[in-house]
Amino acid sequence: MASIDNVFSLGTRFSIPENPKRSILKHATTSSFSARTQTRWRAPILRRSFTVLCELKTGSSSSGETNNSPAADDFVTRVLKENPSQVEPRYRVGDKLYNLKEREDLSKGTNAATGAFEFIKRKFDSKKKTETDKSEESVYLSDILREYKGKLYVPEQVFGPELSEEEEFEKNVKDLPKMSLEDFRKAMENDKVKLLTSKEVSGVSYTSGYRGFIVDLKEIPGVKSLQRTKWSMKLEVGEAQALLKEYTGPQYEIERHMTSWVGKVADFPNPVASSISSRVMVELGMVTAVIAAAAVVVGGFLASAVFAVTSFAFVTTVYVVWPIAKPFLKLFVGVFLGVLEKSWDYIVDVLADGGIFSRISDFYTFGGVASSLEMLKPILLVVMTMVLLVRFTLSRRPKNFRKWDLWQGIAFSQSKAEARVDGSTGVKFADVAGIDEAVDELQELVKYLKNPDLFDKMGIKPPHGVLLEGPPGCGKTLVAKAIAGEAGVPFYQMAGSEFVEVLVGVGSARIRDLFKRAKVNKPSVIFIDEIDALATRRQGIFKENSDQLYNAATQERETTLNQLLIELDGFDTGKGVIFLGATNRRDLLDPALLRPGRFDRKIRVRPPNAKGRLDILKIHASKVKMSDSVDLSSYASNLPGWSGAKLAQLVQEAALVAVRKTHNSILQSDMDDAVDRLTVGPTRIGLELGHQGQCRRATTEVGVAITSHLLLRYENAKIERCDRVSIIPRGQTLSQVVFHRLDDESYMFGRLPQLLHRLQVLLGGRAAEEVIYGSDTSKASVDYLSDASWLARKILTIWNLENPMVIHGEPPPWRKRPQFVGPRLDFEGSLYDDYDLVEPPVNFNMDDEVAHRSEELISQMYNKTVSLLRQNQTALLKTVKVLLNQKEISGEAIDFILDHYPPQTPLNSLLQEQNPGSLPFVPEHLRRESGDFVLVNHSTDVNAQV
């Protein structure tokens, strides 16, 4: 490699800038080089600012023509083109190069004597340099100061205080050479920015202003003295904000220190403030003089005008108005004085010689007033005492006591007037979903209420009473309101507990009043909710030891029930009144109330089926803002046994979750979170398993889930598919596996292959532990093993699906309360149903045989499950790692893993991945929610590794 001298032999000169102020990118490069310098020199990259000027040599035209192309540029030229932001601009003035500041100083006219002075200085420096080169002895600063007898000037910075980080930053921003925004972006694109330093922005936001930055560039190999790696940059606030958003490299922000300062105000004013104050005072004096002059002129004019007006008014009043009004004033004053004189004479006559007082005394004495007042004294005393007593009693009443009303006692025995005269209950049959059977049964009542004459002509007796029974929340009250809303008739609604009061006879009175109101406004509907509080079965008073139960409270309740029985089917049945009762405890009702003639129809309102649940969810979803990507049919099919009230609560809970997560509408994830909160419970924040515990739980749950997917994929099994797996602790559980529910027929007619596949799914948790951990299994899968043991025994004994076919009834070995986390693996509770096939252990040999056959069946299915999971060990381990990383995984993701990790995939392919816990997969509902825009992390390419 050529030396530095070879470079200078090319005519290239280097000069180091002293203190540039701006970054103007101008490069002077040679278009051609001399033909005699063909040696290629690999110079180190110069990162600091430098200036390169290549002088043209004569006789090099031929070589210049060949080097015009970019590929023929020398190394230094290419460095200048690639790193324009690091080259400080230089300007040629004569034969000398100057930076921007030096060129500005030259333009001021001071360079006339500078040339001669610089020439003398260079001569002196060269002479001094030759003298110092000759002397090779060491020179110390103390010796120089000791020998020096002149004045010694020390820079004041030596005695100055240490600058803080913030002050040093401001100084560097001011002194360092400036870099433009375009240069910084070029350096950022080439990854040459080492550090970007800025100062913390204060709490007050400014729309205009500037922010300073210090840019540290990366060093490159080469001469360090020729590199400048530190620059300053000053940008507007908007440009600075845009730059900080765009720049993603290392940053350092200097914290702004807020300190209080207490000091003495200077005795003398600031010269600028003094000049401003004096100018303001002069202007104020001029304005005051102008205002005073204007006031004198305007004041004189106003005074003249006021004097003229007042003079005119005085002359008019004295010489015109007063002569005209004088006769009238004399007349009115004379009449007024005459009236006063006559009145005074009359008053004197009345009050003289006793006057009126003597007449009043005679009337009181001889008119009998005194004797009457003596008789009224005791009467007034009694009245005043009663008034004070009542006033004291009313003042002691509680705050929530009603206003004293004489008719309150009468209204106490009446039923509350809850009739809607127009039948405006606000509910129609269109608002009722999921209980189509009950609605069809009640259509006849609506027809009768709309047209009762048609039934009377045909001689048809409509059903007098209808009992609605069923679990809570299934829509019994809603159906009753829909009947009145469809028919448009008055609707009277009361609860069974409202007929019970502290006073005797109030319940019967309210029954009579309620039916009286309904008969007056017939056709009408009477609805009593929770009728079991009113019509409980009566006690048998003729049985032994039953008199103690027949107390006053029981007698009052039975009296109210008797009145209800009479109103329903007595001598006056009251045609045109439909009676509806609702209860969820039919077994408590009195048999006399349930007989035909009183309750002619008893309609069972059951929980809705899958179609009914879907209709209910659609009705409630129409009242909230729900995303179109939410699949309501999956929730309708996977939530068996849920009533309409619970489905309504699900939608409301999902809306609350969406608000809590600041979503614009209800998403699929919000519905899933709401299902988990209502079934399992909320997330337990304080409970978090360690890594080993999470690995065990994840292995067990993934083993159960992936076994079902493998059986569906390779054996076409008719079992549930996994919906999602979670290891987030909720409620009383540490992990959950949610399955998709099959149709109802699959649970009614279970076949042996289907039950054996379910047995393999239950054994999948323990099998997965053995595949991953070997014989070091844990009790994490004990919940699934208990169900598997009883399922195998029940296949042999009660369901008799294995030979020999012998019924051997026995009760379940343990009682379990199923916790719903999706479609249960115990087949809707039928797993622990003994079908009343329970017998005492008579043949103990049969018990031993059943136990032996159950053990063989479990071992056989367990070995098959272990073999199936060993073939897919890579997919199993990949699913476990993804679950540990994401805490929750969907069934679609499990299918994605099984597609990319087929059976017999080498385990090393998974272990060689950079991040085995990542998965480049987005579920379908998330893709729909994001508008078909999916961002997938391609850090791990599964297709390339499998």
UniProtKB/Swiss-Prot annotation:
Disruption phenotype: Embryo defective. It is a multi-pass membrane protein. GO terms for biological process: chloroplast fission; chloroplast organization; embryo development ending in seed dormancy; plastid fission; protein import into chloroplast stroma; proteolysis. The keyword Signal does not apply. It holds the Pfam family Peptidase_M41. The keyword Nucleotide-binding applies. It is found in: Plastid, Chloroplast inner membrane. ATP binds at G470, P471, P472, G473, C474, G475, K476, T477. Residues 1-54 form a transit peptide. The chain crosses the membrane at residues 289-309, 320-340, 369-389. Functions in chloroplast biogenesis and chloroplast division. Required for plastid development during embryogenesis. Might be involved in chaperone functions or play a structural role in the thylakoid FtsH complex. This is Probable inactive ATP-dependent zinc metalloprotease FTSHI 1, chloroplastic. It comes from Arabidopsis thaliana (Mouse-ear cress).
